[in-house]
Amino acid sequence: RCPFCHNAALVSHTDAQGGLDEEEFFAFLRKRRGILDGVCVSGGEPTLQPDIENFVAKIKGMGFKVKLDTNGSFPDVLRRLLESGNIDYVAMDLKNIPERYGMTVGIADFDVARVIESIGIIKESGVDYEFRTTVVSPLHRASDFEEIARLIPFAPRYYLQNFVDSGDLVSGGGLTELGEDELAKALENTRVIIPQAKIRGEE
C-alpha cells in the first residue's frame, strides 16, 4: 500500500459509506447514456478485483468509453483487459526508481519485474496510454527522474503529479509535495529522456 495513497478508506475498506453496489452503479450509468462519454475505472488497484474483466465489459457494452488506472502490479490481468478491446485508454503509475520501489509501495519484497512487464504490455497493446508519477518528499529526489524516465523512453505522455495531502492517507502523515524549484529540476531531468514530459496541471 503506497503510503501516499489518497484513498485510504477504499484501500483499507474501513468506510463503505457513500458507496454504490453494482446494480445501483449500472442503473446510474443507464440514466446517463448520451450525457456521459466514458468511465474511469480506478482504485485502489482495480486489477485486484476478481470480476474486473466482466465489470469493464459491462461498461463498454453500454456504449461508454473506458479508462483504466493501474499500478501495473498484475500484468496478466492487465494483458487480458487490454486484449479484450474494452479499454480505450490506460494510465499507469510509476512509483519510483527500481531500488526504492518496495519502500515506495509499502511492500519490502515487491517484485519490480511485474511493473516492467506491464510497461511492455502497455507499449505493445495498441491502446492509447500515459504514464505518471506522483512526486512525494521524502520518497523522491529530483535526481531520480532521469532514471525513472529510462524505463519508458518511448512514452508519448509522461506526467509528474506533485503530491497533495487529501487528508485521507494510508501513511497518516509525514509526506509533503516537492518544492517548486525541486519539481522543476525533476521535470528537467525527465526531459533528458522524454522531451515532451509535463507537470500535471501545467499542460
Model segments located where?
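Residue-level detector of family-conserved "landmark" positions at structurally sensitive sites
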Residues: 15, 69, 132, 199-202
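A C-terminal junction/extension of Radical SAM enzymes
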Residues: 184-203
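Short, charge-patterned binding micro-sites
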Residues: 44
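Hydrophobic alpha-helical segments typical of transmembrane helices
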Residues: 6, 24-25, 77, 186
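Canonical Radical SAM [4Fe-4S] cluster-binding loop centered on the CxxxCxxC motif
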Residues: 1-20
